[in-house]
Amino acid sequence: MEVLESKPLSAISMVIDAIGVEHDSQNKCYCCNEQIFDRFICRMDNRSYHENCVKCAICESPLAEKCFWKNGTIYCSQHYYKDYSAHRCAGCKKGVSPTDMVYKLKAGLVFHVECHCCTLCGRHLSPGEQILVDDTMMTVSCMSHYPLPMDDPCPPVGPSDVPSCSSDASAVAPYPMDESFPFQIKKEVDAYGYNFEHYSFSDFCDDDSRMLKRRGPRTTIRQNQLDVLNEMFSNTPKPSKHARAKLALETGLSMRVIQVWFQNRRSKERRLKHLCNYLRHYEQRGLIPPPIHFRNEEMDGTDFNSFCGNFEEEDDED
């Protein structure tokens, strides 16, 4: 009888011991290597922590609500993005946090607002200001550091930025751009967190420039077909696929030709709008805008019919 009573007690003791060993191994703090007896336990990547041990490894600030874990190390938001952000500031070379206010240039460079300064004189560069961008060194500088002659009011534009818009190449780049001076004139295209107007010389170039796109088969549209397309564009600048199919049946043109025609027409409208903003930008400051040359055709500011008859097919889809 006594033997029978001792066996269940022995089994229960073994179970309790086993549970105790497992409990100790799971509730051991990974940071301080001490046993956790707190009511609440923090767990990350199958590792347990005291609440007080969850702090940034750099600034040691306590992280009660949110933390970042990388290679076994805990970081706060500021230091995590500073070291491991996918986007780096071209000025200070530090990471960019999602809450940081930054400038994004057309060359793909990103700057903190406080880091957007001239690399030569240290002057802070304002949004919309013409600047010199060195894609190789990832730096920006003022226009005053560009070697311009005194009798030329219009700064030359690098050939890699703006395609030749005139039959005379010297009208666009009258001064050679050799490898010893790799700067290129660019405009700020976007400013995160701000709503600035932007202007780009490349927006005013003609579609016929070979540097903008490859040459494709040309299609000539008859006047009656053009009238139908213009009427549709005045009502719906971006028709649906079903509407383009109806136009194809009505005009006899292929859907691809109709699609490209609407793409080019919308592009002309946008270019004209940018041109008006570009001229207004100078007029508001009492300045005379530099001349803009277009190759093979003179652009009419109010009538598009003169250059909508012939166009090149593009590869872009709606």
Curated annotation (Swiss-Prot):
Native organism: Caenorhabditis briggsae
Gene Ontology MF terms in the entry: DNA-binding transcription factor activity, RNA polymerase II-specific; metal ion binding; RNA polymerase II transcription regulatory region sequence-specific DNA binding
Name of the protein in question: Mechanosensory protein 3
GO cellular component labels: nucleus
Annotated ranges, domain LIM zinc-binding: 27-86, 87-152
Gene transcribed to yield this protein: mec-3
Keywords, comma-separated and alphabetical: Developmental protein, DNA-binding, Homeobox, LIM domain, Metal-binding, Nucleus, Repeat, Zinc
One Gene Ontology term from the biological process aspect of the record: neuron differentiation
Subcellular location: Nucleus
Function according to Swiss-Prot or TrEMBL: Specifies differentiation of the set of six touch receptor neurons. Binds cooperatively as a heterodimer with unc-86 to sites in the mec-3 gene promoter.
